[in-house]
């Protein structure tokens, strides 16, 4: 069947079978003589056949460029002379086919089949020849599997190469078509529109990532201009390995910021003008004469030491004077007596004052109603007189004078009414003021709550109960979310055995038992008695008994502030005047005991020590040790007489060098003796009193 198609740049089938094969790039294009295409009668093109021919031509080109290909060299002109794909393959004999087969299998196993050599491997094309050659032999499935695997890899690499080339071509076509569309749009836009030509817009390209480091970094010349030359000079002379180059110690500090400055940045201190002192003048001191006369009175500086004479001092008289002073001081009214009774001005208040211990008790609740503390609530109440309590307000000195006490005492700088507000040194803050009670507060009586009663005989107006109010009648969202199924439903019961909690997972037979504190603590304490402070060891080493107030490990109960408690027993109270009020008991100090121990490692040549000890035991002369010829004689010598270890140690002090003799100790010498006893077959025998060791030769 013949058809007529326009021939404008299309492919034309060769007229004769002997004509040479031309690739699409080198095939000549017909030149049309007229603008109208000419229709010719010719047979239809076989597109599939042309596609195969193009593939084979590319295979041959890659084969010629690959040096590892087993194919023979064929010129492109000779390779394009055939019409069928089989005629384009190189003619190989059986030996070359087997070599080519082994090469393909080797490349497949080493995974070295790439796009460069995939088109030069003809394992797929010679598959039929290989099967014909193997027909006579038994079928080897291992060889067949390897052949199929290598063929699949070769074909896959070829497909990937063709796919990549096609995408390259498509990318180039897209760019060219876009460029042609832009030129066409510009031609259409540049038409005659009022005789004006639109300016061409340029697209600005922005780079989000800068790849040139020179545009980011500053040049070296710009950096050098900002560096202080004085700093460069100081840094060049700085040596980190010497004390002369300590750089920071030479810097100056300015102002309170403690900022270090170089010499060029240091600001000089501002100096103020010196003020001239006023000129001396005379003044009238007649008014000050009376004051000077009072200061010149001959009064003793210390009345208690007025009769003291440095060269005539008597210890007995001094002790009598001190005892008289102590008795006089004890009888004085200014002495603080802890056993004194409470003054009459203090009267127990009707209601206890809330202190820091009752801070957690709610309002309206009496602390005495809580458990067993109700019995002892009297000891925790503060005694004060509310009626006579005078509040300190803003005023002048006359107002403050009213607060002073009429009777002087050690702690009576203020009146007892003012001191009642003071809770002790532990509670240094004053209590807040209490509001003055009015008549309305006293007359206020708590009304009893009316009991709710329901009368079924009365006529009830339901409109009053069911009227609309401003209050919300629906539940809020938070209430609805809290009352969900999860909060009102118990968790699933897994029937877990609680006994497994006390068992170990890896050792189920072992059970964990909980030991109580009483079992583990009370048992050893029962056997321990009270400590005897009068034992000879403590009395000989001076262990003074401290007062109860100096002990921080008191096991007694907490009694609270002393000013707030009542009903204390006299057993827990102490007499502060046992040592005198102004005396302080010195703390117990541990005696410093010097312990001699080796603070540095001692260096000892053990070989030299062994040789010297053996020569001393064998009674060899000292000059014989240094002679190399007599070494064997020294080793072969034996101990003839019994010797004592103490005498051997003293003899080593003379034979060893001074440094080794100083570092030699009895343990080192005895360790060396044990080594010699093992090597020389010596016998060591101790004395009855364990004072020394006898050394003798064992038979």
From Swiss-Prot:
One Pfam entry name: Cnd2
Protein modification = Phosphorylated by CDK1. Its phosphorylation, as well as that of XCAP-D2 and XCAP-G subunits, activates the condensin complex and is required for chromosome condensation.
Signal peptide residue numbers? none
Q: What GO molecular functions are on record for this protein?
A: chromatin binding
The UniProt annotation puts the region (Disordered) at 1-35, 176-203
Entry keyword annotation includes DNA repair? no
Localization per record: Nucleus; Cytoplasm; Chromosome
**Which cysteine-cysteine pairs are annotated as disulfide bonds in the entry?**
none
Q: What GO cellular-component annotations does this UniProt entry give?
A: condensin complex; cytosol; nucleus
The record ties this protein, via InterPro entries, to: Condensin_barren_su2
Q: What residue ranges are annotated as transmembrane?
A: none
Q: Which domain of life is it from?
A: Eukaryota
Q: Which UniProt keywords apply?
A: Cell cycle, Cell division, Chromosome, Cytoplasm, DNA condensation, Mitosis, Nucleus, Phosphoprotein
Gene Ontology biological process terms from the UniProt entry: cell division; mitotic chromosome condensation
- Self-association state and partner proteins as the record states: Component of the condensin complex, which contains the XCAP-E/SMC2 and XCAP-C/SMC4 heterodimer, and three non SMC subunits that probably regulate the complex: XCAP-H/NCAPH, XCAP-D2/NCAPD2 and XCAP-G/NCAPG.
Q: According to its UniProt record, which protein family does this protein belong to?
A: Belongs to the CND2 (condensin subunit 2) family.
According to its UniProt entry, the function of this protein is described as: Regulatory subunit of the condensin complex, a complex required for conversion of interphase chromatin into mitotic-like condense chromosomes. The condensin complex probably introduces positive supercoils into relaxed DNA in the presence of type I topoisomerases and converts nicked DNA into positive knotted forms in the presence of type II topoisomerase.
- Name it: Condensin complex subunit 2
Q: Which organism is it from?
A: Xenopus laevis (African clawed frog)
């Amino acid at each position: 069947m013949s058809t007529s198609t326009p021939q404008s740049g299309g492919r034309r089938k060769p007229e004769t079978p002997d004509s040479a094969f031309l690739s699409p790039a080198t095939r000549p294009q017909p030149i049309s003589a007229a603008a109208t295409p000419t229709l010719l009668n010719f047979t239809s093109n076989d597109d599939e056949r042309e596609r195969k021919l193009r593939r084979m031509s590319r295979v041959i080109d890659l084969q010629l460029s690959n040096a590892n290909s087993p194919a023979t060299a064929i010129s492109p002109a000779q390779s394009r002379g055939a019409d069928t794909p089989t005629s384009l393959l190189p003619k190989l004999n059986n030996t070359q086919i087997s070599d080519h087969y082994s090469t393909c299998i080797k490349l497949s196993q080493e995974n070295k089949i790439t796009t460069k050599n995939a088109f030069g491997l003809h394992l797929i094309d010679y598959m039929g020849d290989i099967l014909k050659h193997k027909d006579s032999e038994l079928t080897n499935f291992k060889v067949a599997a390897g052949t199929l695997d290598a063929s699949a890899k070769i074909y896959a690499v070829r497909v990937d190469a063709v796919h990549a080339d096609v995408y390259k071509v498509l990318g180039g076509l897209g760019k060219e078509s876009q460029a042609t569309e832009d030129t066409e749009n510009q031609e259409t836009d540049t038409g005659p529109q009022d005789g004006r030509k639109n300016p061409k817009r340029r697209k600005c390209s922005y780079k989000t990532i800068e790849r040139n480091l020179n545009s980011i970094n500053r040049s070296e010349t710009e950096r050098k201009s900002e560096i202080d030359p004085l700093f460069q000079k100081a840094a060049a002379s700085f040596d980190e390995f010497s004390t002369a180059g300590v750089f920071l110690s030479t810097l100056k500090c300015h102002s309170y910021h403690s900022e270090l400055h170089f010499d060029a940045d240091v600001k000089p201190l501002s100096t103020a003008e010196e003020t001239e002192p006023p000129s001396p003048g005379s003044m009238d001191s007649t008014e000050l004469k009376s004051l000077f006369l009072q200061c010149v009175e001959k009064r003793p500086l210390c009345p208690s030491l007025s009769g003291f004479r440095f060269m005539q001092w008597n210890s007995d008289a001094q002790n009598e004077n001190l005892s008289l002073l102590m008795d006089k001081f004890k009888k004085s009214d200014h002495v603080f007596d802890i056993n004194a009774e409470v003054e009459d001005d203090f009267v127990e208040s009707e209601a206890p004052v809330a202190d820091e211990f009752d801070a957690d008790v709610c309002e309206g609740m009496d602390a005495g109603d809580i458990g067993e503390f109700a019995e002892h609530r009297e000891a925790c109440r503060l005694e004060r007189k509310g009626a006579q309590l005078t509040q300190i307000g803003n005023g002048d000195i006359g107002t403050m004078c009213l607060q002073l006490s009429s009777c002087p005492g050690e702690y009576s700088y203020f009146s007892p009414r003012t001191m009642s507000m003071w809770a002790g040194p532990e509670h240094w803050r004053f209590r807040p003021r209490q509001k003055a009670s009015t008549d309305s507060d006293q007359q206020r009586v708590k009304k009893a709550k009316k009991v709710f009663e329901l009368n079924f005989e009365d006529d009830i107006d339901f409109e009053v109960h069911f009227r609309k109010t401003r209050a919300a009648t629906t539940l809020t969202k938070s209430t609805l979310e809290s009352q969900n199924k999860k909060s009102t439903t118990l968790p699933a019961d897994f029937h877990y055995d609680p006994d497994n909690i006390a068992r170990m997972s890896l050792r189920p037979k072992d059970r964990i038992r909980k030991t109580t504190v009483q079992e583990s603590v009370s048992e050893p304490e029962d056997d321990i008695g009270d400590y005897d402070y009068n034992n000879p060891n403590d009395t000989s080493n001076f262990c003074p008994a401290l007062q109860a107030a100096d002990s921080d490990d008191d096991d007694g109960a907490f009694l609270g502030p002393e000013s707030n408690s009542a009903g204390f027993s006299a057993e827990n109270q102490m007499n502060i005047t046992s040592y005198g009020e102004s005396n302080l008991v010195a703390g117990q100090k541990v005696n410093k005991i010097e312990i001699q121990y080796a603070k540095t490692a001692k260096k000892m040549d053990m070989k030299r020590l062994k040789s010297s000890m053996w020569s001393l035991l064998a009674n060899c002369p000292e000059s014989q040790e240094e002679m190399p010829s007599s070494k064997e004689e020294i080793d072969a010598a034996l101990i003839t007489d019994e010797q004592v270890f103490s005498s051997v140690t003293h003899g080593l002090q003379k034979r060893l060098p001074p440094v080794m003799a100083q570092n030699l100790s009895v343990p080192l010498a005895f360790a060396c003796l044990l080594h010699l006893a093992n090597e020389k077959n010596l016998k060591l025998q101790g004395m009855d009193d364990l004072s020394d060791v006898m050394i003798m030769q064992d038979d």
